[in-house]
Design a protein with these regions (language model features):
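Transmembrane alpha-helices and immediately adjacent membrane-cytoplasm interface residues
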Residues: 33-58
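Residue signature of alpha-solenoid helical repeat architecture, marking inter-repeat boundaries
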Residues: 43, 80-84, 118-121, 159
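Amphipathic alpha-helical segments of tetratricopeptide repeats
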Residues: 70-75, 108-114, 146-152, 156
């Protein structure tokens, strides 16, 4: 796991090497080396361990996702802001099964740092609304559900929001 700035330095050094290959008229080598530099740039914006954790989470393998996230030792140094948001988002989702208080902390931090996609932000707010509901904070849960409904433009979370509203009537 490289620091985020080291990834950019490596990408720039590889790009300089590719330019040298172009100058030496080794065009195919230069193109191949540029593709290699592109991988480092891609991993600057999309962290490889977070991508692998998402894949494990899609398979409902929480232990595998936790293992991949464990490789990120210092998220502040290794990840850009949005990736830190997703790092906390993934931790919050995994902890919501076992420790609600800890999950709430991670999900709030993820919302504060920001998530790239609106449906991820809506899901985080819906999770927070569920946690607030279990802790008998009805007003906060209602506000979070309203925010999640605004963010859910494609209607992917419509059923979950309806279920939570039905449960809230019982409180």
């Amino acid at each position: 796991m490289f620091n985020k700035n080291i990834k950019l330095i490596i990408a720039s050094l590889i790009t300089i090497w590719a330019i040298y290959q172009f100058i030496q008229v080794h065009i195919m080598n230069g193109i191949s080396i540029l593709l290699l530099a592109g991988i480092f740039v891609l991993f600057y914006f999309k962290n490889e361990f977070i991508l692998l954790a998402f894949l494990q989470l899609r398979k409902q393998n929480f232990e595998g996702a936790k293992k991949w996230l464990g490789y990120i030792k210092k998220p502040e140094a290794a990840l850009i802001t949005k990736q830190q948001g997703y790092f906390n988002y993934l931790h919050g989702i995994m902890l919501s099964q076992t420790n609600m208080t800890q999950a709430e902390k991670f999900l709030r931090k993820a919302v504060r740092l920001g998530l790239s996609m609106d449906h991820d932000l809506a899901m985080a707010k819906l999770q927070l609304a569920g946690i607030a509901m279990t802790k008998r904070r009805k007003r906060e849960a209602t506000n979070l559900m309203a925010e999640a409904k605004k963010l859910d433009k494609n209607g992917m979370l419509k059923e979950q929001i309806q279920q939570m509203k039905q449960q809230m009537k019982k409180i």
